[in-house]
Amino acid sequence: YRIQNMKVLGEDKVIGRDVTVREMIEEVEKDRAYYYRSGGGITLSGGECMCQADFSRDLLRAAKERGINTALESMACAPFETIETILPYLDLYLMDIKHTNPAKHKEFTGRPNELMMENARKVALSGKCKLIIRVPVIPTFNDTVEEIRGIAEFANTLPGVEQLHLLPYHCLLYTSD
């Protein structure tokens, strides 16, 4: 994954920058007192962290070595062998489940959901971290009582899942004249 040069409001902008695990953990360390007082820590999220699984694993490991709590937000679309490498360094997995129907999931997201559902089961069965299922509630896709009930029933079959979070859908649209 490369740093991107983009046009933002007509101007060239560099979006993001390359960083090392050391640089990231030094930044994280600045808030250590806050993490200690609040019981918080770091959460890897935004985009799909498992697309950079080695970096994610190394950053989570560095945080755990320093006694910092760790969490990952992901839709679990990577092979389980990849996910398994981060589990020893993870306290909490915030896993997105968008739909229980593979065909509808594929129609909406471009990929079926069987791998993600199986990974949810494997993470739960591993017992290596706490697992919270999160559902972005999206109008006309999964906002029915039946679908939310189906996801809740699936989550209820996973050992150790104590919470299911329903997340409101945000549509950030703008028009230019």
Q: Where on the chain are the PLM-derived regions?
A:
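Short, solvent-exposed beta-strand-terminating loops
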Residues: 168-172
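Canonical Radical SAM [4Fe-4S] cluster-binding loop centered on the CxxxCxxC motif
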Residues: 1-17
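Conserved AdoMet/S-adenosylmethionine-binding subsite of the radical SAM
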Residues: 25-167
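Conserved small/polar residues in nucleotide/adenosyl-binding loops
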Residues: 174-177
